[in-house]
Swiss-Prot record:
InterPro entries: MODA-like. GO terms for cellular component: virion component. It catalyses: L-arginyl-[protein] + NAD(+) = N(omega)-(ADP-D-ribosyl)-L-arginyl-[protein] + nicotinamide + H(+). NAD(+) binds at R72. Changing F129A: Complete loss of enzymatic activity in vitro. This is NAD--protein ADP-ribosyltransferase modA. The gene is modA. The active site is at E165.
Amino acid sequence: MKYSVMQLKDFKIKSMDASVRASIREELLSEGFNLSEIELLIHCITNKPDDHSWLNEIIKSRLVPNDKPLWRGVPAETKQVLNQGIDIITFDKVVSASYDKNIALHFASGLEYNTQVIFEFKAPMVFNFQEYAIKALRCKEYNPNFKFPDSHRYRNMELVSDEQEVMIPAGSVFRIADRYEYKKCSTYTIYTLDFEGFNL
């Protein structure tokens, strides 16, 4: 879900209180996260690690049911695979997706991947990255020399809220069910995918 401006401002104000940060940190620790994993969640907001194995272990044990359509802008290397005429796609890394179609359009546009290709799919189980990343930001302790930590925290929470990101584990298998054209500023190709299973 997308958080309101008032909710994010409330998170920011409360996160200025050390006791609130400590309470949220304890909540994450009680859910099985360690401090390094909490930092990894924050790192993933802007840049996923090259090695997804650690991230994959984090999300596999925290999947929740999902019945909503997901959207993903397709990067160039995946577009090349699609051009080979395949029917089955197995993701060998953790896959990010959004509940917001416009986020996928942005990533597929010339502003990011410049592929004009999007996936539309459902995954029965997802990791709610948005929820945990917001919590990780709310409990983050910044270096004392870091300037404007609360503004930085707020901007990152805005980004996480806007992207409405979830993740699915590496080894997720989908079948290409359909393909159609979609026009918005430019013409996009949207592939609809049916979930086949987890090859974990």
